């Protein structure tokens, strides 16, 4: 009888240890899987496309040019009240932008996340202010320049954002592809008017004279 009691106690102890191990190891797993403390959001994606009678390389040359950031006020006259650039214009560069009165959002920061020359792909993420103050937890612009012929391409722009459910009706009418469309229009116009300009100095001169 004594042996059976000892075995029973041992099994109980073993079970307790295993349960504790499950709790200790299982909780990080649940955190990792997003089951605990998960913030519920709604994902939205909006798109804009512009066909351009210029090569994808010519269009991408401007989009990927590190000097583009400092010339945004020249490319989009009247849009900015203030523009501060932190970085060299490449990946990791942060733009602190304040727009003219009456524009919304009035101020926010964005960061260049990706500049992929092979696939002509650029990603820019809003990291502070703007829609992030209105329940948006993630906001990413993507520009993809896709060739459709030797001297033709399409600029595919999109915005993906994640927003808390209670803010969806507030931000949905505000977030549009307008800024991406304005940039695509400005760059395509620049390239079409100055097709012979292919290096950085020529592009800079062309932008300044827009």
From Swiss-Prot:
Expressed most abundantly in the rhizomes and to a lesser extent in petioles, roots, leaves and flower buds. It catalyses: (4-hydroxyphenyl)acetaldehyde + dopamine = (S)-norcoclaurine + H2O. GO terms for biological process: abscisic acid-activated signaling pathway; alkaloid metabolic process; defense response. Its EC number is 3.5.99.14. Dopamine binds at residues 108-110. SUPFAM superfamilies: Bet v1-like. InterPro entries: Bet_v_I/MLP (IPR000916), Plant_def-hormone_signal (IPR050279), START-like_dom_sf (IPR023393). Concentration-dependent dimerization, but mainly monomeric at concentrations around 10 uM. Belongs to the BetVI family. This is S-norcoclaurine synthase. It comes from Thalictrum flavum subsp. glaucum. The lineage of its organism: Eukaryota, Viridiplantae, Streptophyta, Embryophyta, Tracheophyta.
């Amino acid at each position: 009888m004594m042996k059976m009691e000892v075995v029973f106690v041992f099994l109980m102890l073993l079970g307790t240890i295993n349960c504790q191990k499950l709790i200790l190891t299982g909780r990080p797993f649940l955190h990792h899987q997003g089951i605990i403390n998960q913030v519920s959001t709604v994902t939205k994606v909006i798109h804009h496309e512009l066909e351009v009678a210029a090569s994808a390389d010519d269009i991408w040359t401007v989009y990927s040019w590190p000097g583009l950031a400092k010339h945004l006020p020249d490319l989009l006259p009247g849009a900015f009240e203030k523009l501060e650039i932190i970085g060299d214009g490449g990946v990791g560069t942060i733009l602190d932008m304040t727009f003219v009165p009456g524009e919304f959002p009035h101020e926010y920061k964005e960061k260049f996340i990706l500049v992929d020359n092979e696939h002509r792909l650029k990603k820019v993420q809003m990291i502070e202010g703007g829609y992030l103050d209105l329940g948006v937890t993630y906001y990413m612009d993507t520009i993809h320049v896709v060739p459709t012929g030797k001297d033709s391409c399409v600029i595919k722009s999109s915005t993906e954002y994640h927003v808390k459910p209670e803010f969806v009706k507030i931000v949905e009418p505000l977030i549009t592809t307008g800024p991406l469309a304005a940039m695509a229009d400005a760059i395509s116009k620049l390239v079409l008017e100055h097709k012979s300009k292919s290096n950085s100095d020529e592009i800079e001169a062309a932008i300044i004279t827009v």
